[in-house]
Design a protein with these regions (language model features):
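Glycine- and acidic-residue-biased ligand/ion/polar-headgroup-sensing regions
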Residues: 73-92, 100-102
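Ligand-binding loop in jelly-roll beta-barrel domains
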Residues: 95, 109-136
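Extracellular/periplasmic catalytic domains that process cell-envelope and extracellular macromolecules
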Residues: 50-52, 72, 97, 118-123
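A short, N-terminal "cap"/entry segment at the start of jelly-roll beta-barrel domains
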Residues: 2-10, 16-56, 89, 105, ...
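Short acidic-glycine-tyrosine-enriched beta hairpin
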Residues: 52, 62-63, 92-109
């Protein structure tokens, strides 16, 4: 992986990790240790056939009861659940609970209203695969 791609991957993951940490703490300020999510970067890769776009792949782990605040990615985001149970919802759609092997999609205009571990006792882990504009943040708060 070249230095530019590595820097982009680390920057995207750092922004997402900071956002997950602060958003999760806000969900239950009395128990910040209970709600933290962590993001682990796996890959950032330019898409030469789609100028100006890149793929970002990472894993997100929620501790039991963990959640994030409403947000958007301005990207096509595909989620694949590895373990545990995850509650997902975008505006205009009913919430869904996903288990291992199940998938979820967020479109570029979607506000991701709910992203949470559906269990109060077990962690949840999922892979995030996003196609996004280069040099733009991976995640931002919902308007």
């Amino acid at each position: 992986m070249n230095t530019r791609n590595r820097l982009a991957m680390l920057t995207s993951a750092a922004l997402l990790a900071c956002w997950l940490s602060s958003a999760s703490t806000a969900a239950d300020p009395a128990r910040p240790e209970k709600n933290r999510g962590t993001a682990q970067p796996l890959l950032t890769q330019d898409l030469p056939d789609i100028p100006g776009k890149e793929v970002v792949v990472l894993t997100v782990t929620y501790l039991p009861g963990g959640a994030s605040l409403p947000h958007r990615h301005d990207a096509d985001v595909f989620v694949y659940v590895l373990e545990g149970s995850v509650l997902m919802q975008v505006d205009g759609q009913p919430p869904v609970t996903l288990g291992p092997g199940q998938t979820f999609h967020e479109g570029p205009g979607d506000i991701h209203r709910q992203s949470a571990n559906a269990s109060a006792t077990q962690p949840a882990k999922f892979v995030v695969f996003m196609i996004k504009d280069k040099n733009k943040p991976a995640t931002r708060a919902a308007d």
